[in-house]
């Protein structure tokens, strides 16, 4: 193998037109890799630090020239000379160079851009696909997609409290067919909304964000769209929601408030019953962040009450951090973790979180951010780790479709003999009976 000879970073733009960090890595024998970092809109308070300039006269304070300079002036000097395939050592060297628990000195956006670029340069030098380089010959599971077709909460300007309403083609035989089913349902949803005079412009993640009367109306539209596309709700396409409850939690009153819709308030016990009612009524298979990120005991409560029926995903709760995940596993909080590479800041730490989850029987869902780029690393990562589920937006916007297109390419490369799409069985954190209940709902 050959050594890294050059690392260079620049400021580019994400899908929202905000600056982000792009890094390039070059090797002695001609290997080349590029990594671009995404950015979130609703972020967990314990996430690794995304370093921004804060200069209000430039990009309204969102510039990343400091992070870029940290790559070019500090990280490059440390990492040039490393063997490009020594990913773990390189990631650990950058973590040590930063020296803070949250990567606040150099910026997780600076470190992650280099981490991704290094992996891509190594794959390029070895002339193998990225998923193959990261996961070896065992990489073969194509993920069940979570397609965010209706946006609410912090991701929109409407009167819907839940942040995301998603469809999951759990009955598809392949990822290609899953994407087709999702696309058809998306277009039927658009027709249904338009016929009712609702706005069909799309939000950050490619989903629709019209006004609805309450949080159940989007679910009713999803059922209608699934049926209009010729599929059976539950059996063919299940529903997932991201409550993003930290946005609803009021720490003073200790209640959840439907702040975007009715203004109704719930105690934790009442809010759990509210969610339980939705699960009983609709073919919901997954709920993300149903409880505020700092209320650990309440997470244990909802897991004991709902965790055998549906997937309970920790996003802001775990922030892709093995320390928080380890605590959650020990306490019995949640049964799934959302994996966002920029929440933790290196590929090595990301993969450690995925493996820890799988060993504990938790599912790991590899996820995009609301501010995305053309970088398709997460599509390769989800296959490399056989994680089984991916969350990467709706059926519109090139930054989202780039990941779906990459998954279809990977499925072709693996061929039908090797590639495996598990659909409903990707929910190995739920019992066979629970999965059947979703299918039969």
Swiss-Prot record:
Catalytic activity of the protein: (2R)-2-phosphoglycerate = phosphoenolpyruvate + H2O
Places the protein is found: Cytoplasm; Secreted; Cell surface
Cofactor(s) the protein requires to work: Mg(2+)
SMART domains: Enolase_C (SM01192), Enolase_N (SM01193)
UniProt main location, coarse: cytoplasm
Binding locations of (2R)-2-phosphoglycerate: 163, 340, 369-370, 391
Listed InterPro entries: Enolase, Enolase-like_C_sf, Enolase-like_N, Enolase_C, Enolase_CS, Enolase_N
Active site: 205 (proton donor), 340 (proton acceptor)
Record SUPFAM superfamilies: Enolase C-terminal domain-like, Enolase N-terminal domain-like
GO BP term (any one): glycolytic process
Free-text cofactor note: Binds a second Mg(2+) ion via substrate during catalysis.
Chain positions recorded as Mg(2+) binding sites: 242, 288, 315
Entry superkingdom: Bacteria
Secreted listed as a keyword: yes
Cellular component, GO, one term: cell surface
EC code: 4.2.1.11
Annotated family: Belongs to the enolase family.
Role of this protein: Catalyzes the reversible conversion of 2-phosphoglycerate (2-PG) into phosphoenolpyruvate (PEP). It is essential for the degradation of carbohydrates via glycolysis.
NCBIfam families with a match to the protein in the record: eno
Protein name: Enolase
Organism this protein belongs to: Ligilactobacillus salivarius (strain UCC118) (Lactobacillus salivarius)
Gene encoding the protein: eno
